[in-house]
Amino acid sequence: MLIWLVELSEYFKFLNLFRYITFRTGAALFTSALIVFLFGPTIINSLRIRQGKGQPIRADGPQTHFKKAGTPTMGGLMILAGIVGASLLWADLSNVYVVATLLVTLGFGAIGFYDDYLKVTKQSHMGFSGKARLGIEFVIAGIAVYFMMRTALASGVAGSTFGSSIAFPFFKDFMINIGIMFVVFGGFVIVGAGNAVNLTDGLDGLAIVPVMIAAASFGVIAYLAGNVVFANYLQINFVPGTGELAVVLGAVIGAGLGFLWFNAPPAAIFMGDTGSLALGGTIGTVAVATKHEIVMAIIGGLFVMETLSVIIQVGFFKMTGRRVFLMAPIHHHFEKKGWTESQVVIRFWIIAVGLAMLGLSTLKLR
């Protein structure tokens, strides 16, 4: 919104700063963190009073988790406030990619909020119906992908099929056009990302730091993909307008830092599905917008690993009646093996950093 003040730069030279994505990204990060820091304590106290027993703890989980009973959930409300507030201030709201990303952020956040609400009120892990939840997520993601696809097609930068094509890392010009099915593909990426982060969010600080790492990585990718000079130099797809998504991701990082202040062990609040679905959906949307969906599987490899562990566990158990892991998602398996919570969290952070570096290296490998 503040970018519109650039029109007054003829009279106030300092307003020229608002032209620069890098400046607004830093400002969004700071603003978002400040919002969470300022309103976090009030939100936490309010949720603690309203929820009473807080988030239900799994009876079959590690014994160390029972001491977390009574910790409030829905901390994603703090994150959403930071992201949306900072984005409204610093991002270009006439940009379709920004609007589509915020649509997913808020839409997935609302789904997660309803799921958290049901879990808290019932004191059960059985929240929103899985099929209904996925169905609504696909509708929201599909709408966002459709409008982003149309915007990319209208740009005409790389031909009439660019918006509906899948790009592949390591190859300069290799793309596969799948037409309108790109809406389904993009929706799958976004929904998958949202639920992958949701599965990862099981320990204090475990999900939020890898999310910030992924956000920083995709902030770089969005900035480069939206700049014709950098895109041509690196031989990646130039997608006009996606540079503005770096501002939104700056807000994600700021909100993440603010939330981590309160989520650091012992956590004063959990982000819940409200936060995890929204954050994952946001990252997934940026990946689709920038044509780096496959690279997201590398940068977000930790989330992929967590998701695969659940799929393998459930599938193998249905076929054989036996389990591959002591408990899924896989971070609980390592807890059962005797790792402390801090060991699991920090080691998974290290993995996330390594995967992000590997993912970013694909930008130069053409």
UniProtKB/Swiss-Prot annotation:
The chain crosses the membrane at residues 27-47, 71-91, 93-113, 134-154, 174-194, 205-225, 245-265, 268-288, 294-314, 343-363. CDD domains: GT_MraY (cd06852). It is a multi-pass membrane protein. Belongs to the glycosyltransferase 4 family. MraY subfamily. The keyword Secreted does not apply. This is Phospho-N-acetylmuramoyl-pentapeptide-transferase. GO terms for biological process: cell division; cell wall organization; peptidoglycan biosynthetic process; regulation of cell shape. Its EC number is 2.7.8.13. Pfam families: Glycos_transf_4, MraY_sig1. It comes from Rhizobium leguminosarum bv. trifolii (strain WSM2304). GO terms for molecular function: metal ion binding; phospho-N-acetylmuramoyl-pentapeptide-transferase activity; UDP-N-acetylmuramoyl-L-alanyl-D-glutamyl-meso-2,6-diaminopimelyl-D-alanyl-D-alanine:undecaprenyl-phosphate transferase activity. Pathway: Cell wall biogenesis; peptidoglycan biosynthesis. Its main location: membrane. GO terms for cellular component: plasma membrane. Keywords: Cell cycle, Cell division, Cell inner membrane, Cell membrane, Cell shape, Cell wall biogenesis/degradation, Magnesium, Membrane, Metal-binding, Peptidoglycan synthesis, Transferase, Transmembrane, Transmembrane helix. Its cofactor is Mg(2+). PROSITE patterns: MRAY_1, MRAY_2. It comes from the Bacteria. It is found in: Cell inner membrane. It catalyses: UDP-N-acetyl-alpha-D-muramoyl-L-alanyl-gamma-D-glutamyl-meso-2,6-diaminopimeloyl-D-alanyl-D-alanine + di-trans,octa-cis-undecaprenyl phosphate = di-trans,octa-cis-undecaprenyl diphospho-N-acetyl-alpha-D-muramoyl-L-alanyl-D-glutamyl-meso-2,6-diaminopimeloyl-D-alanyl-D-alanine + UMP. Catalyzes the initial step of the lipid cycle reactions in the biosynthesis of the cell wall peptidoglycan: transfers peptidoglycan precursor phospho-MurNAc-pentapeptide from UDP-MurNAc-pentapeptide onto the lipid carrier undecaprenyl phosphate, yielding undecaprenyl-pyrophosphoryl-MurNAc-pentapeptide, known as lipid I.
